Regions:
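Short, glycine-rich nucleotide/cofactor-binding loops
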Residues: 6-13, 100-101
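Hydrophobic/aromatic ligand-binding patch that stacks against planar heteroaromatic rings
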Residues: 109-113
């Protein structure tokens, strides 16, 4: 069982993060620590000049009035009193490929995890309204499990996974 910090840049109540949370929670301990509002395009920016408010929404769900990277840092350093095994950012509404990764808050949140020496995975789907988000979430879980169970070091790396808008059919 992994302890997973799940974040994104689309907001804690976005459909895709909720779906991934449900699927990952079937076999793992998962906490959503994600932006209060949509923060797409924030890259790995941090809120060093602003006070950041954290709101507990549910037992394992926190909304952060800050950037996606703020969510990773706060989740890993102060919100909980244990260590996570991995940081997962996504599932992003829209692909993060090519130059998009330079601006992506989804990738930025994963970079925050990497900067604190945690294995990070960013996940995106090439659609703002995926045909079958349950299928994408299930495939994401399979990949996350394989990467984590491989015991290969992700030190200094960010895994960036992009799915086409596909369904199980």
């Amino acid at each position: 069982i992994m302890k997973i910090l799940l974040t994104n840049d689309d907001g804690y109540d976005a459909k895709n993060i909720k779906t991934l949370y449900e699927k990952l929670s079937e076999n793992h301990e998962v906490w959503i620590i994600a932006p209060k509002n949509n923060c797409s395009g924030m890259s790995a920016a941090i809120s060093y000049l602003n006070e950041i408010e954290v709101t507990k929404i549910d037992e394992k769900i926190y909304a952060v009035d800050g950037t996606p990277a703020d969510c990773s840092y706060l989740g890993l350093l102060s919100i909980v009193d244990f260590e996570f095994d991995i940081v997962v950012s996504g599932i992003n509404h829209g692909a993060n490929i090519g130059n998009d990764v330079l601006y992506s808050g989804t990738v930025g949140a994963a970079i925050g995890g990497r900067n604190l020496k945690y294995p990070p995975i960013a996940i995106s789907v090439a659609s703002y309204d995926a045909k079958d988000i349950d299928y994408i979430a299930n495939k994401s879980c399979e990949i996350i499990n394989k990467i984590f169970n491989s015991k290969q070091t992700l030190k200094g790396k960010v895994i960036n996974i992009n799915f086409p808008d596909i369904s199980e059919e």
